[in-house]
Amino acid sequence: MGPARRSAKLTRVTKGKNKVSGAAEAAYLADAALADNFDSLLAQAREAEQAFRHAQAVGAPADEQYPLAQRLSAALTAAMRAAYAAERAEIGPRGYEDRIYRRQAKARPAVHALTDEAERLLTLRETYQLTGFPARPKTQALGVQVARLPSH
């Protein structure tokens, strides 16, 4: 069906349906700006992880490891947020309001790759938080006993 044969009523419906609100456009622009920083945030997370792993490898005391662990957690969180923002930016502004459009867009390979990267960073952050970070040094100063799991 060519452009001359289209119904005027359907043309109006289609044009009006694809409009994006100002709030969705603003959220999209904010996510696009955050997504632009993803590579630098990921590099900061890698540097923080290397510093933390080095401190663990040399057997640094918990007082030295704890700030490095906090820095790693913050860097992983920032990189993860940027990855999810990149996913939303790849979907586009219409995805903020149209759940069907968003779901269809998530099936695209480019969006799927960004989702995988964001979830990988989320899993890495949670793994470190559950198993890899030392206890806060202030607990010793407060006289609070911290439960420790036996090491195998």
Specify the residue positions occupied by each region the protein language model found.
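Short, charged, amphipathic alpha-helical segments
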Residues: A62-S73
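Charge-rich, solvent-exposed alpha-helical interaction surfaces
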Residues: N37, Q44, R71, E117-R120
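Short, charge-rich amphipathic alpha-helices with coiled-coil/heptad character
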Residues: G2-Y28
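Amphipathic alpha-helical binding modules
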Residues: P93-H152
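Short, charge/polar-rich alpha-helical segments
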Residues: V20-L42, H54, V58
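Non-transmembrane amphipathic alpha-helical segments
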Residues: L41-A55, A75, A82
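Soluble, cytosolic/nucleoplasmic coiled-coil alpha-helices used as oligomeric scaffolds and tethers
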Residues: V58, Q65, A78, A85, ...
